[in-house]
Amino acid sequence: MVDNSKIRVVVGMSGGVDSSVSALLLKQQGYDVVGVFMKNWDDTNDDGVCTATEDYEDVKKVADKIGIPYYSINFEKEYWERVFQYFLKEYKAGRTPNPDIMCNTEVKFKSFLEYALDLDADYLAMGHYAKTMVDENGVTHMMRPKDGNKDQTYFLSQLTQEQIKRVMFPLQDLTKPEVRRIAEEAGLVNAKKKDSTGICFIGERNFKHFLSEFLPAQGGDMVTPDGKVVGHHAGLMYYTIGQRQGLGLGSTKESTAPWFVVGKDLEKNQLIVEQGYDSPRLYADRLQASGMTFFTGNPEEDTEFKATAKFRYRQCDVGVTVKYYAASKTADVYFDEPARAVTPGQALVLYNGEECLGGGNIDAAFKDDKKLQLV
């Protein structure tokens, strides 16, 4: 029988209820648990309050309550170089990035994992809602968790086998209400603390205002696909494919249908808009993705397979056929049915039933072999 007390687990503690309960459960299971708070961003809010300081106070209270040592580590430099610069580069190129995925890949499960191993940890644990399973060959697979509503495999989709084999997800068989109940019964100070939302380095701040601090906005024309000017945009980086809100456009003599963003022309600095949710320009039958990573290891040869996919968080899976090219780690992904608002810069995540296979970054979308969106 395995003696858990000889297995050291470093838990990434954010000050939130999920990571706190993860630490509590591991402690109850007899592991040698060490809590570590990561500071990735100088996140002083608009009131001049550093929210990281408040979160660390919660970490200290929880760690003291459950009886584990705790530390704080600063990864602001790594975050700035590997995540935030990528975020700015993508927006500057007219794409809509997902920095949370890059943060997991480059900071939480890379720099932080290396730090945990330096503390002689056998495993790193997080408060993510995800599940791992080890097969008879010792290969670790990423699976959907019990709580499908909180499933975070989308954000973990670009991790490698070397990373996930060292990770534990204590919440994998729990729902969020169950986690809160455990926290309340244990008397944890953050049992009712609200979940963090949005991009971690923006927090509750206005997105446009935040982005304009780093990327000067350049306004331009809103045009229809045939070039008619119908309005003015505040900067291409503020809009995403399929967006309806915030365009400031009313009905026309021809139609009362709402307007949607259907493309961007970077050379002309034009935002392309069209009326109607079902605009053909919003529907793709294929996408191209790069940086493909598979949890169980990338195939060494070109391969074709059926799967289901998400190309945005909380989206229902859609059926796809994947053509993977081993040399370039790229893929052509063909949709079983035309897919709406496939957005360059976002993540493609592949599934086979309950298993998350991996994913990559969307480079372009196509309809009848014609590139959409002009980005």
UniProtKB/Swiss-Prot annotation:
Chain intervals for the UniProt region annotation (Interaction with target base in tRNA): 98-100
Keyword Repeat: no
Region feature (Interaction with tRNA): 150-152, 312-313
GO molecular function: ATP binding; tRNA binding; tRNA-uridine 2-sulfurtransferase activity
Disulfide bonds: C103-C200
Catalytic activity: S-sulfanyl-L-cysteinyl-[protein] + uridine(34) in tRNA + AH2 + ATP = 2-thiouridine(34) in tRNA + L-cysteinyl-[protein] + A + AMP + diphosphate + H(+)
Residues annotated as binding ATP: G12, M13, S14, G15, G16, V17, D18, S19, M38, G127
Keyword list, A-Z: ATP-binding, Cytoplasm, Disulfide bond, Nucleotide-binding, RNA-binding, Transferase, tRNA processing, tRNA-binding
Compartments where found: Cytoplasm
Gene3D superfamilies in the record: Adenine nucleotide alpha hydrolases-like domains, HUPs, Translation factors
Entry's Gene Ontology BP terms: tRNA wobble position uridine thiolation
Catalytic residue positions: C103 (nucleophile), C200 (cysteine persulfide intermediate)
EC number: 2.8.1.13
GO cellular component: cytoplasm
Top-level taxon of origin: Bacteria
Site (Interaction with tRNA): H128, Q346
Function: Catalyzes the 2-thiolation of uridine at the wobble position (U34) of tRNA, leading to the formation of s(2)U34.
NCBIfam families with a match to the protein in the record: PRK00143.1 (NF001138), trmU (TIGR00420)
Protein family: Belongs to the MnmA/TRMU family.
Protein's recorded name: tRNA-specific 2-thiouridylase MnmA
Organism: Lactobacillus delbrueckii subsp. bulgaricus (strain ATCC BAA-365 / Lb-18)
UniProt gene name: mnmA
